[in-house]
């Protein structure tokens, strides 16, 4: 599968990412590079590999489960198209 410039433009629009027209060929190239890597994964022999196992026997690192305030409100709201009084503002959807 090959990604052309129009497909790259459509993906950027769907992802709500502003991409200038002169950057679209590079973006399409990056998409094609990613898809090429994914196609290489199809060549890996996984017949004898159990699903959901790791290639190295490791336990996951665990952390203490504590409640925090997160302190991320400003960072999260900086991505919002419209934020008011510390909350996401969205159009009314119910009459």
UniProtKB/Swiss-Prot annotation:
Coiled-coil spans in chain: none
Catalysis performed (reactions): L-glutamyl-tRNA(Gln) + L-glutamine + ATP + H2O = L-glutaminyl-tRNA(Gln) + L-glutamate + ADP + phosphate + H(+); L-aspartyl-tRNA(Asn) + L-glutamine + ATP + H2O = L-asparaginyl-tRNA(Asn) + L-glutamate + ADP + phosphate + 2 H(+)
InterPro entries membership: Asp/Glu-ADT_sf_sub_c (IPR036113), GatC (IPR003837)
UniProt keyword terms in alphabetical order: ATP-binding, Ligase, Nucleotide-binding, Protein biosynthesis
Pfam families in the cross-refs: GatC (PF02686)
Class of enzymatic activity (EC top level): ligase
Gene Ontology MF: a single term: ATP binding
Lineage: superkingdom: Bacteria
Subunit structure: Heterotrimer of A, B and C subunits.
Family listed: Belongs to the GatC family.
PANTHER family: GLUTAMYL-TRNA(GLN) AMIDOTRANSFERASE SUBUNIT C, MITOCHONDRIAL
Function: Allows the formation of correctly charged Asn-tRNA(Asn) or Gln-tRNA(Gln) through the transamidation of misacylated Asp-tRNA(Asn) or Glu-tRNA(Gln) in organisms which lack either or both of asparaginyl-tRNA or glutaminyl-tRNA synthetases. The reaction takes place in the presence of glutamine and ATP through an activated phospho-Asp-tRNA(Asn) or phospho-Glu-tRNA(Gln).
Protein name in UniProt: Aspartyl/glutamyl-tRNA(Asn/Gln) amidotransferase subunit C
């Amino acid at each position: 599968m090959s990604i052309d410039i129009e497909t790259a433009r459509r993906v950027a629009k769907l992802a709500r990412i502003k991409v200038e027209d002169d950057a679209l060929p590079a973006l399409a190239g990056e998409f094609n590079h990613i898809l090429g890597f994914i196609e290489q994964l199809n060549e890996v022999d996984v017949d004898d590999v159990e699903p959901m196992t790791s290639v190295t026997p490791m336990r996951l690192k665990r952390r203490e489960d504590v409640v925090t305030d997160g302190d991320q409100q400003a960072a999260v709201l900086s991505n919002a198209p419209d934020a008011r009084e510390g909350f996401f503002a969205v159009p009314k959807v119910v009459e």
